[in-house]
Amino acid sequence: MLLLITGASGMGKTTVRKIVAAQFADQLESAELAEVAGPPEWSLRWRHQAVEKAVQRAVKVQRDGKHFLLCGDPVPPAEVYAAPSADQPESIAVCLLDASEDSQRLRLMDRGDAPSLIPNHIAFARWMREHIANPRHRLDVIKQGGWEEMQWDRWITATDQQKAWKSHRIDTTGLDPVDVGELAATWIRQQMLSIRHQPHFPNKKAPQPGLGSKQALPAIPRLW
């Protein structure tokens, strides 16, 4: 199974990854995009290609009997589902780390982010919030200038199947990082327990032996 814990900047992705990776060390492998795709080029095309490499890693880890967690980058769920190899993991599950705009702004200021970029991060958080609720919302934001190998048609078909779009939101506003980590860990446990009852793509090929059975707005500033 591929688990995606995502969110805009300032939502606590890196901290959460450290917490859950330690708890599930014997059950899952975790990584950020740069760890599977090399130094970032900060382009949409690079991110799409990096997501595909992460999906391929998830498939490899799956063959070894573990799950794979992608956490640490602001990856929109649609990019995972549209990756060329996204029909190969036994399941995909998405968790969005979110927070109020005031909370996000304070976190970004406290960690020293450039004030001129903070409105961009907040706008992207709004987009991500809508994206997990409405998978087809403003897909132009992540399609234009992207990698031509992305399977967007397959992605649109998948969103017609309610069970193919599994997302969960954790509101981190006012929460201690450890508490957020525990909420994320609880979500991971729930996904592991229910994986056999969560179909991925409806017309997916039968798994190979050993693999198991298996969301008029202003323009959104790009952060990549």
Stretches with model-predicted labels:
Residues 5:
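Hydrophobic anchor at the beta1->P-loop junction of P-loop NTPases
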Residues 8:
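P-loop (Walker A) phosphate-binding loop of NTP-binding proteins
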Residues 11:
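ATP-binding Walker
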Residues 14:
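Walker A/P-loop
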Residues 17-59:
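Conserved substrate/cofactor phosphate-moiety recognition/catalytic segment
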Residues 49-91, 96-101:
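Glycine-rich phosphate-binding loop used to anchor ATP phosphates in small-molecule kinases
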Residues 114-180, 201-202:
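Small-molecule kinase domains that catalyze NTP-dependent phosphoryl transfer to phosphate-bearing small molecules
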Residues 205-217:
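Positively charged N-terminal leader segments that act as targeting/secretion signals
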